[in-house]
């Protein structure tokens, strides 16, 4: 059994995947924005209960590595590393934009051509990457202002919802799905990473540095 979760967006998504049956056993998403630290553990327990298993039945973990806000990413990655250590099972990281791309390309409403994934990077910017019609990444991810990346190509992800003038051809999904994160790992459909955060810029909250010298 593979447990997958992503905390790179304002919502937490968790899924349980049975590789033997090639199917999603259970999936849940948080109902409230943010509060990742309060919501992730209960969602994991709910998914395990839905699947009728306990943690010791897990054989692997999958976690979204971003890019995304520092606080949310840290919650998911620390949880993944801790569980993997305690249970002595492997943990695989996947770029959260790749997860969105796989569902856009291979899900129930496939884009059918090259497309872009744009997610909210705050500060009126987006995380952006381009993909082929099978969801394979061609370029990126980068952090850019929407106006600088405006395109008529299909755009999956929350960026198309937030900036429709720059990305008028919005496609689903808007957010990454833990079910597709699990499929990405189980089927080796995306590049696998260590469970370390994918940052494209410094976190908003940074430790103060040494005082600057003054003449």
Regions picked out by a protein language model, each given a short descriptive name:
Residues 38, 42-45, 77, 81, ...:
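N-terminal, well-ordered alpha-helical segments
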Residues 44-60, 108, 150-153:
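Phosphate/pyrophosphate-binding loops at sites that engage ATP/ADP/AMP, CoA/4′-phosphopantetheine
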Residues 1-24, 31-38, 92-215:
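Oxyanion-binding and handling regions
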Residues 60-90, 96:
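DPxDG-like acidic metal-binding loop motif
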Residues 29-32, 44, 67:
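Short, well-ordered turn and helix-capping elements at secondary-structure junctions
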């Amino acid at each position: 059994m593979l447990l997958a979760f992503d905390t790179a967006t304002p919502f937490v998504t968790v899924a349980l995947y049975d590789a033997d049956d090639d199917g999603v056993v259970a999936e849940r998403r948080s109902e409230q924005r943010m509060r990742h630290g309060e919501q992730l553990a209960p969602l994991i327990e709910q998914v395990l209960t839905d699947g009728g298993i306990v943690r010791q039945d897990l054989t692997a973990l999958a976690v979204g590595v971003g890019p995304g806000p520092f606080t949310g990413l840290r919650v998911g990655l620390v949880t993944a590393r801790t569980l993997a250590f305690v249970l002595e099972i492997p943990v695989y990281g996947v770029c959260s934009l790749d997860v969105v791309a796989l569902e856009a390309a291979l899900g129930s409403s496939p884009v059918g051509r090259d497309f872009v994934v744009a997610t909210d990077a705050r500060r009126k910017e987006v995380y952006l990457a381009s993909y082929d019609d099978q969801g394979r990444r061609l370029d990126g991810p980068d952090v850019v202002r929407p106006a600088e990346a405006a395109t008529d190509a299909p755009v999956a992800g929350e960026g198309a919802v937030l900036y429709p003038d720059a990305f008028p051809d919005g496609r689903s999904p808007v957010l990454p799905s833990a079910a597709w994160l699990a499929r990405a790992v189980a089927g080796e459909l995306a590049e696998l990473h260590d469970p370390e955060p994918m940052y494209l810029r410094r976190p908003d909250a940074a430790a103060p540095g040494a005082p600057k010298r003054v003449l």
